[in-house]
């Protein structure tokens, strides 16, 4: 019998309702806002069969992707082999996590500037840091108490200010501060110092400035500006590292699911959505779009995570298509 975590059906049902609503809007052509409707098509192409999987491996929902300093690509999925590593040419290196309860609520992975891998688990309410040797170096959050399942739909059911309630993503400031988008339950952003001490949190469920409805992804730019994918409100919110509100961007036709931000002096943000990827500058202008909804190669189905090691390369984790795509500029 397949073991299922009691928290996941609620999460997936909520995501399904959100995606169906967004898809209806996208297919009808209604709700196009701002410059997204006028943005050009990005000159990206799919690199077919880039990843060389072991013949016996079958992926589950592909929900995370990250690239380390060596150019190795890490794929996170909800199958029996939850974490896979490929080299820069797409050759399979290893798989990790088979049979581990740690990956029951796998949600996302990131590499910090020191090349440590951070894993976000929405079921255990934990964010786990692994060092370069793959050893657990730090854990933020804690497993929920049994009574939490009985109060799952109650706002603020987790009273500990440093605890999470279905966290979704992580990013880091230049001073080592850690920011967690938290998430399906708490609808806030939590800040920790470089030693892992809780500093502050901001936001609650709502649609006002600084409020969130499922903050699903978070990144920071070279100017130390934070960008939060406020998925349930179909918008992007912008803050400084103290949580002060700066801007809100409403110029995408669908909800933002995932972010990556390119390195280098001229940064851009790639945004994954239901069946499309958007490219934005740091002022929020939509520079281009790519893709349309579908499950055949070249289309996209729930872009749950994106990674962009440079401006001309995007890796897209498609949750419902159960695959990871490599896209490159033509």
Predicted regions: what they are:
Residues 9-21:
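Bacterial N-terminal signal peptides
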Residues 1-11:
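Bacterial N-terminal signal peptides that target proteins for export
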Residues 23-25:
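Sec/Tat signal peptide C-region and signal peptidase I cleavage site
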């Amino acid at each position: 019998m397949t073991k299922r975590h009691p928290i996941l059906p609620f999460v997936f049902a909520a995501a399904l309702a959100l995606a169906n609503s967004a898809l209806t809007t996208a297919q009808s052509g209604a709700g196009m806002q701002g410059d997204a409707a006028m943005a050009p098509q990005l000159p990206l192409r799919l690199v077919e069969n880039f990843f060389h999987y072991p013949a016996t491996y079958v992926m589950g929902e592909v929900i995370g992707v990250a690239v380390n300093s060596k150019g190795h690509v890490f794929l996170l999925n909800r199958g029996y082999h939850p974490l896979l590593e490929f080299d820069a040419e797409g050759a399979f290196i290893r798989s990790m996590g088979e049979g581990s309860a740690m990956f029951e609520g796998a949600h996302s992975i990131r590499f910090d500037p020191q090349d440590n891998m951070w894993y976000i688990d929405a079921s255990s309410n934990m964010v786990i840091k692994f060092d370069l040797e793959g050893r657990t170096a730090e854990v933020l959050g804690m497993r929920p108490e049994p009574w939490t399942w009985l109060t799952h739909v109650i706002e603020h059911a987790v009273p500990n200010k440093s605890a999470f309630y279905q966290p979704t993503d992580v990013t880091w400031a230049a001073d080592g501060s850690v920011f967690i988008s938290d998430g399906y339950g708490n609808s806030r952003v939590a800040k920790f110092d470089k030693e892992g001490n809780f500093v502050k949190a901001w936001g609650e469920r709502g649609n006002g400035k600084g409020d969130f409805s499922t903050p699903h992804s978070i990144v920071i730019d070279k100017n130390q500006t934070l960008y939060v994918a406020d998925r349930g409100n179909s918008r992007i919110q912008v803050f400084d590292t103290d949580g002060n509100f700066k801007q809100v961007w409403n110029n995408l036709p669908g909800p933002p699911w995932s972010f990556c931000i390119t390195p280098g002096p001229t940064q851009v943000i790639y945004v994954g959505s239901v069946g499309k990827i958007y490219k934005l500058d740091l002022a929020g202008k939509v520079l281009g779009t790519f893709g349309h909804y579908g499950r055949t190669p070249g289309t996209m189905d729930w872009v749950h995570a994106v990674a962009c090691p440079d401006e001309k390369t995007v890796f897209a984790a498609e949750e419902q298509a159960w695959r990871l795509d490599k896209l490159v500029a033509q």
